[in-house]
Regions:
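C-terminal regulatory/oligomerization modules of transcriptional regulators
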Residues: 1, 123-149
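N-terminal leader segment of winged-helix/HTH proteins
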Residues: 1-30, 77
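N-terminal positioning helix adjacent to the helix-turn-helix/winged-helix DNA-binding module
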Residues: 5, 34-36, 98, 125
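Alpha-helical linker/hinge and terminal dimerization helices associated
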Residues: 12-23, 58, 102-118, 136-147
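N-terminal helix-turn-helix DNA-binding core of bacterial DNA-binding proteins
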Residues: 20-64
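Short, locally clustered residues in the helix-turn-helix/winged-helix DNA-binding domain
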Residues: 41-45, 107, 134
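Charged, amphipathic alpha-helical coiled-coil/dimerization segments
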Residues: 71-131
Length: 149
């Protein structure tokens, strides 16, 4: 198992999920879930991101993400406003001051993780690692086509 690449990637993915839960609980508090924080993160860096794009980012269905957005709005983390995109009426999500405070707190902690990683990996190693992960996904996608929700 130790030398099996697929196992190592799966193990790392599971480790990362556990890490995110613990990181969230210890560093960001219980004000939002890891997925909700990912939504805040995405909205901060891409304010025009659509619900469909959020669903792909989170590997969740559009309806599920819609429920999450509604819950986040009811808790005052975001505000959803009617807007148009390509002549289609959509609900655009805007981070509220409360959501911005949570984002800033989490982002500050995230930067500590990023710094730790950069201390241990060169820029070239990071680029190579990212390329290898992309290559792995492309290879296994030729066996079973994974549809993102």
């Amino acid at each position: 198992m130790e030398e099996n690449l697929a196992y190592q990637i799966d193990y790392t993915a599971n480790f990362n999920k556990s890490f995110r839960r613990e990181f969230q609980a210890q560093k960001i508090a219980e004000c939002c879930s890891p997925d909700e924080f990912t939504i805040l993160y995405a909205l901060h860096f891409n304010p025009n991101i659509s619900q469909s794009e959020l669903a792909k980012l989170l590997f969740k269905g559009k309806a599920h993400v819609g429920k999450m957005l509604n819950k986040m709005e009811s808790r005052g983390l975001i505000k959803r406003v009617a807007d148009t995109r390509n002549n289609i009426i959509i609900k655009r999500s805007i981070i509220t001051p409360k959501g911005t405070n949570i984002f800033k707190m989490g982002h500050k902690e995230f930067l500590k993780i990023k710094e730790k990683i950069q201390e241990n990996f060169s820029k070239e190693e990071m680029e190579q690692f990212i390329n290898y992960l992309g290559k792995f996904r492309r290879i296994i996608s030729t066996i079973v086509d994974v549809k993102l929700k």
